[in-house]
């Protein structure tokens, strides 16, 4: 059974500010995430990558990545940003 998606308000704000084509790509990626997470043999194009204990990233669009936590009842999307912003986030440990 697919788990729920919970999205941090800051990630929602960032998503709303995107141009329409990027917003559509990101929303499609989010809609696929619960179904493909944990199924490594399904090619989804999301590029899910483990960043740490229970911490992952997936492709939102060509330039943007979602950082999310794998929680028991949900996938918590804590950040949306480009590659460099994700590197800074991880270096500073500012994810929830």
Region locations from a protein language model:
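Non-catalytic, surface-exposed connector residues within folded enzymatic/regulatory domains
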Residues: 5, 27, 42-45, 80
């Amino acid at each position: 059974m697919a788990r729920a998606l919970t999205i941090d308000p800051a990630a929602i704000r960032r998503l709303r500010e995107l141009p329409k084509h990027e917003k559509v790509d990101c929303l499609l990626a989010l809609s696929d995430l619960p179904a493909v997470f944990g199924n490594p043999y399904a090619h989804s194009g999301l590029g899910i990558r483990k960043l740490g204990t229970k911490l992952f990233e997936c492709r939102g669009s060509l330039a943007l990545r979602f950082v999310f936590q794998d929680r028991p009842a949900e996938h918590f999307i804590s950040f949306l940003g480009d590659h460099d912003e994700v590197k800074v986030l991880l270096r500073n440990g500012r994810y929830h």
